[in-house]
């Protein structure tokens, strides 16, 4: 099982300031934890939204000479033709779907949940949104790619998220996941879901990281899709 069973500490959470009627589930990148992203969301929070930043389980990562680190699934390489950890990706997606189910049980409908992530976490958020039967409000995918892209149809996906809103962000100087992968991913996404709902934003001078303007764009995207209901 390579430890991919969410046997990780409980998520970092930014609770809603009043009754939570919407949620953002955001998945960190390779080797990171949810804490830094929880802090970032605390800086752009809206009162009725709960922000959930889970921590990946620790596992050996092929890309990093089998060193053990927090990782949602194994990464073998970062080029478009690298082998992919299909079993690990699918298992990780099931774990994210279980997190979404948990929020639904807590009283937040899935169509009031935005899934997002950075780098490896962004890749997992895209894969999960495109394969789940849970209708989601949107995806915010940062500095990432679509994993197992050959497993998707040539035309639009079936299922509940055909019209999902996707905000994809990428730095134009990203040395790890080059901008080209991001733009190829955006083009692929436009064939899988309603292309009018896919937004691809690039940030001048940004490397494999985030920036203030990107966080403001994310806030605008979240607040538009998850307005207060009361």
UniProtKB/Swiss-Prot annotation:
Top-level class of the enzyme under EC nomenclature: hydrolase
GO biological process, one term: negative regulation of Golgi to plasma membrane protein transport
Domain of life: Eukaryota
Pfam families: Abhydrolase_2
Active site annotation, chain numbering: 119, 174, 208
Record-level GO cellular component terms: cytoplasm; endoplasmic reticulum; nuclear membrane; plasma membrane
InterPro entries listed in its UniProt record: AB_hydrolase_fold, LYPA1-2/EST-like, PLipase/COase/thioEstase
Residues bearing the modification N6-acetyllysine: 224
Alphabetical keyword list: Acetylation, Cell membrane, Cytoplasm, Endoplasmic reticulum, Fatty acid metabolism, Hydrolase, Lipid metabolism, Membrane, Nucleus
Subcellular localization(s) per the UniProt record: Cytoplasm; Cell membrane; Nucleus membrane; Endoplasmic reticulum
Reactions that this protein is recorded to catalyse: S-hexadecanoyl-L-cysteinyl-[protein] + H2O = L-cysteinyl-[protein] + hexadecanoate + H(+); 1-hexadecanoyl-sn-glycero-3-phosphocholine + H2O = sn-glycerol 3-phosphocholine + hexadecanoate + H(+); a 1-(9Z-octadecenoyl)-2-acyl-sn-glycero-3-phosphocholine + H2O = a 2-acyl-sn-glycero-3-phosphocholine + (9Z)-octadecenoate + H(+)
EC id: 3.1.2.-, 3.1.2.22
Entry GO MF terms: carboxylic ester hydrolase activity; lysophospholipase activity; palmitoyl-(protein) hydrolase activity; phospholipase activity
Record text on subunit structure and interactions: Homodimer.
Function of the molecule: Acts as an acyl-protein thioesterase. Hydrolyzes fatty acids from S-acylated cysteine residues in proteins such as trimeric G alpha proteins or HRAS. Acts as a palmitoyl thioesterase that catalyzes depalmitoylation of proteins, such as ADRB2, KCNMA1 and SQSTM1. Acts as a negative regulator of autophagy by mediating palmitoylation of SQSTM1, decreasing affinity between SQSTM1 and ATG8 proteins and recruitment of ubiquitinated cargo proteins to autophagosomes. Acts as a lysophospholipase and hydrolyzes lysophosphatidylcholine (lyso-PC).
PANTHER family found in the cross-reference section: ACYL-PROTEIN THIOESTERASE 1 (PTHR10655:SF22), LYSOPHOSPHOLIPASE-RELATED (PTHR10655)
Listed name of the protein: Acyl-protein thioesterase 1
Lineage: Eukaryota, Metazoa, Chordata, Craniata, Vertebrata
């Amino acid at each position: 099982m390579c430890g991919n069973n969410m046997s990780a500490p409980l998520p970092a959470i930014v609770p809603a300031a009043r009754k939570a009627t919407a949620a953002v589930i955001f998945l960190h990148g390779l080797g990171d934890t949810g804490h830094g992203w929880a802090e970032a969301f605390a800086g752009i929070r809206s009162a009725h939204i709960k922000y959930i930043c889970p921590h990946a389980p620790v596992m050996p990562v092929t890309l990093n000479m089998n060193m053990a680190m927090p990782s949602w699934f194994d990464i073998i390489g970062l080029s478009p033709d690298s082998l992919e950890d299909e079993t690990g990706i699918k298992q990780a997606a099931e774990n994210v779907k279980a997190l979404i189910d948990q929020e639904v049980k807590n009283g937040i409908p899935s169509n009031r949940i935005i899934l997002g992530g950075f780098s490896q976490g962004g890749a997992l958020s895209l894969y999960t949104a495109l394969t789940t039967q849970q209708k989601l409000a949107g995806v915010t995918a940062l500095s990432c790619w679509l994993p197992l892209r050959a497993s998707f149809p040539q035309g639009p996906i079936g299922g509940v998220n055909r019209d999902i809103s996707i905000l994809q962000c990428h730095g134009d100087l990203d040395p790890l996941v080059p901008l080209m992968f991001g733009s190829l991913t955006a083009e692929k996404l436009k064939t899988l879901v309603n292309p009018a709902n896919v937004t691809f934003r690039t940030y001048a001078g940004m490397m494999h990281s985030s920036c203030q303007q990107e966080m403001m764009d994310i806030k605008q995207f979240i607040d538009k899709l998850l307005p207060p209901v009361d």
